[in-house]
Amino acid sequence: MTFDPFVDRQYSKNTLLKFGGYHMSLAPGKYVYKNRYKKELLGYKKYYNDLTKVIKYFNFLPFDEVLEFETKIAEAIINHYSDKERDIRIPLDEFLSRYQGFDWITYFKALNVKNYSDNLSLEYPKIYQEIFKVIGEKDTMWLKKYLAWRFVNSVAKYASPKLNSIHHSFYWKVLKRQDIFKYIPGYNLLNIDKTFLGVLATREYEKYFINEEIKADFLNVIEYIRNSFIKQLDDLTWLNVSKDKIKHRLEKITFNISNQKYVKSYSKINFDENNYLKNIMTLRRINLDERFSNIGKTLKKDNWFSSSGFRTYASNSFLTSEQYYSAAYLQYPLYNLKMSFYEKVCAIGFIIAHEFAHNFDPNGILYDENNNKNLILSKDEYREYKKLIKSLKKQIDNYRIKDKTPFRGKIQICEVMSDLIAFKVILKALKEDGYTSKEDIENIIDRFAKTFACTQSVDSLLKNSNSCHPLQEVRVNLVLSNIDDFYDIFDVQPQDKMYVASEDRCRIWPN
C-alpha cells in the first residue's frame, strides 16, 4: 500500500476540495508534490525496509508454493460455508481487469463455488482459450500463476459481509503462525503490487487483442463518436461564444490504444519466475525512490498516467488532449471485430463517449483549448451551465440505497454527468442514423445498462460510495431518469422510484 498522489483516488477531504475532484486528469499543470506528503512517504520507506527482511525468507521459495499456500486458505474459507453463502460475487469490471487469460470457470468448479457465472457471458473462457493458442505454454506459465494468485487473493472481497469478515479473521490466524509475518501485522504480504507483472502481461495480452485491423476499426468508432459530439454542439442553446474553442479542443484529441507510450522502462530488472516477491520489491523500491526525488518538482504533462493494458481502463487528459483505451476493452461483449457498427456504438461506444463527455463536466470546462487551466466558457455561459447541472447534483445527493443516501453530488457529478451526456449523444446520433423504433431505443437503453452490469453485493458496493465513480446502479438509474425516451418506452409514472419530473431533469444536453 503506497501513497501516490497521482494514482490513488482516495484523497483526503482537504485534498479533494483543493483539487476539485478525484479524477486523475484533474491534476493542474503546476501541481507539485507537497512537503506534507514527505512524512507519509518516510513512513512507507520504513515499511519497505521492514519488508526486505521478509524477502530473505522468500528468496528460495518457488512461486508455486506461495500460490499453493494461498489456495489452501481460499479453499478452507469457501468450504466452511453453506452453498448459499458461497455465492462469490464478481463485478464485470473486476473480472475484465484481473482474470484475463485464466480459466476461471474451471477454477471456480474446483473450489465448488456456486453461481459463478449467472450474469457473465460464457464467451469469455472461449476468448481466453484463443489467447493461449497464440502464446507458448512456457511463456504463459508465469502469467497463469499471477492471475491465479490475483484471484485467490481477492476471493472474499466480493462475498457477503459475514464471509468477508470471517475471511480476514481466519486468514490472519493462519498467517500469525508463521514468524516471518510479524514484520507486517495486519497486512496481506502477497498483496503488494501488480504493476510489474501487469506490464509483462500487457505485452502478451496485446499480441492477441491489438492488430492493425482492430486498431483501424476501433478508431472508426472513435471518430463517429467525436463527430457526433462536434455536430451536436450546435444544439446546445446555452453555448454560444465558446463553441468554436470547444470544437477545436475536441478536434485536437489524439488516441492511444494500449498504454505502451506511458509504461515505464523496467528493462534493467531481471525477471525471475521463481522469485516473484523479489521482482515486486525491486520494482517498489524504484517507484518509491522516484517519488522521493519528485518532492517539490512540477508535474510533467507526460507523467500523469500509469496503468496496465490488461486492465479495463479508459481516460481523458485535459493536460495533453489525449485519450487512452486499454487493450482489455477490445473484446466481447464491449467489442468484437465481427459486431455490426451499430452494436459497437451501443457497446464500446458508451465508453468512448463517456471520455469525450468529460470535456464538458465541471472539471473539463476549467481547461481551455490550449490545455491551460483557464475556464473555456464565458461568464454568461458558465452561469447558465451551473444552473443546468444543479438538478443532477441534487439527484445524486438524494439517491437512496438500503434507506441510505451515501452519495455526494459535489464529488460524483463529473462521472454521472459524463455518463448522461454520453448516453444522450449516442442516442441522438443513432436516431439520426435511422434507429428510431421503440425496439431500437429499448435496445440502446438495454445495452447501456449492461455496460455497468455486475454481481457485486450491495454492501460491497457501498464501501466505495465515496469514490468519484458512484455505484453501477446509481450510474444507470440516474442517467435513465433524465432521459425522456426512457419514460415513453417503459411507461414510467410519478409513483415509480426512478421518476423525475420533466422540469427537474438535467438538460445540459438536448434529448
Predicted regions located by residue number:
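Intrinsically disordered, low-complexity linker/terminal regions across diverse proteins
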Residues: 63, 72, 76, 87-105, ...
